Amino acid sequence: MSDLYNEGTEELLLNMGPQHPSMHGVFRMVVRLQGETVTGIEPKIGYLHRGLEKIAESRTYPQFIPYTDRLDYLASPHNNLAYVQTVEKLMGLEIPERAEYLRIILAELARFASHQVFIASAALDMAGWTAWGYPFRDRERILDLFEMMSGSRLTVNCMRIGGVSAEPPAEFWPALESFLDDMPEKLEEYFNIYMGNEIAQARMKKVGILSKEVAENLCITGPALRASGVQYDVRKAEPYGIYDRFDFEVPVLYGCDTYDRNLIRFMEMNESLKIIRQAVRDIPEGPIMAKVPKIIKPPAGEVYHRVENPKGELGFYIVSNGTPKPERVKIRAGAFVNLQCLNEIGVGTYIQDLIASFASLDAVLGEVDK
């Protein structure tokens, strides 16, 4: 009987995406299956490629800022920040204190909102409809704050070379204080509904293992790296802006599984709230823009700068030839690099567990495809 069974089994090729709702964008996986067990994964990317690096060569330095919003569009202030700080580093610009604090507030709000989308979508991938609704409900409050600040809710475009785009209106600060007061209780609510669920735990614990050694060898960054036992965060390792003034911890977990890659984001959200509170307390009065020339022409040279994006390390490499337009722009996208570990976390698991494991990487295809 066993011989008959073995003769009747064959490898199945399954296409997942690019329209699959669990692909978090136009991403496609060619999955090899033996029964329900995954034996191989071939990622297929590029469906959202827009040639941003090439576009940058035909735009002036300020003109390219809105394009960066379209990288990780769930955390656009981080993309803005990485780019403008790279140009400022090339120019040797000193940024006003108030602008530095506003940048931190916007960036950490974006990190919080990005993780809210992660929690909601990861829960929905396992049919957790209730856990999906709560984070999206509260994320609206952050989008309201972005709208007050910039007029836009998603592609915020709030950073400028030399500072920020606008002074927050008077109603921004009470709304922010109310948000900070309410969120600890809301986070506990998300945790109990999602991470406390026995079915979710059974589908995530000891599944999708990404060991410390493999994570380091593949240059994985962000929450996926910290959930594999590596306490590394650019904000601490190489502080940019004024992050060195803030008291916060870099969460680290050692389970190396899908569960820990979810849990680490809850821990990071608490740290983001802590940073925002300190920024609101300490923000000084003063200008929000440095004195910059109307036509920005950084000196000829090259520069690389990186920030801690919610998805991983985001870096910009810019080559300047002394004209108003860059000669070359290279973007190091954390979500793109992190996809390298897909076979590591997926092969050997069941097809239904692959969905949760892939979701735990929190890949956004705008950043992957550029």
Swiss-Prot record:
It catalyses: a quinone + NADH + 5 H(+)(in) = a quinol + NAD(+) + 4 H(+)(out). Keywords: Cell membrane, Membrane, NAD, Quinone, Translocase, Transport. The keyword Disulfide bond does not apply. It is an enzyme of class 7 (translocase). It is found in: Cell membrane. GO terms for cellular component: plasma membrane. SUPFAM superfamilies: HydB/Nqo4-like. It is a peripheral membrane protein. Gene3D superfamilies: Cytochrome-c3 Hydrogenase, chain B (1.10.645.10). It holds the Pfam family Complex1_49kDa. GO terms for molecular function: NAD binding; NADH:ubiquinone reductase (non-electrogenic) activity; quinone binding. Its EC number is 7.1.1.-. InterPro entries: NADH_Q_OxRdtase_suD, NADH_UbQ_OxRdtase_49kDa_CS, NDH1_su_D/H, NiFe-Hase_large. HAMAP family: NDH1_NuoD (MF_01358). NDH-1 shuttles electrons from NADH, via FMN and iron-sulfur (Fe-S) centers, to quinones in the respiratory chain. The immediate electron acceptor for the enzyme in this species is believed to be a menaquinone. Couples the redox reaction to proton translocation (for every two electrons transferred, four hydrogen ions are translocated across the cytoplasmic membrane), and thus conserves the redox energy in a proton gradient. Belongs to the complex I 49 kDa subunit family. NDH-1 is composed of 14 different subunits. Subunits NuoB, C, D, E, F, and G constitute the peripheral sector of the complex. This is NADH-quinone oxidoreductase subunit D. The lineage of its organism: Bacteria, Bacillati, Bacillota, Clostridia, Eubacteriales. The gene is nuoD.
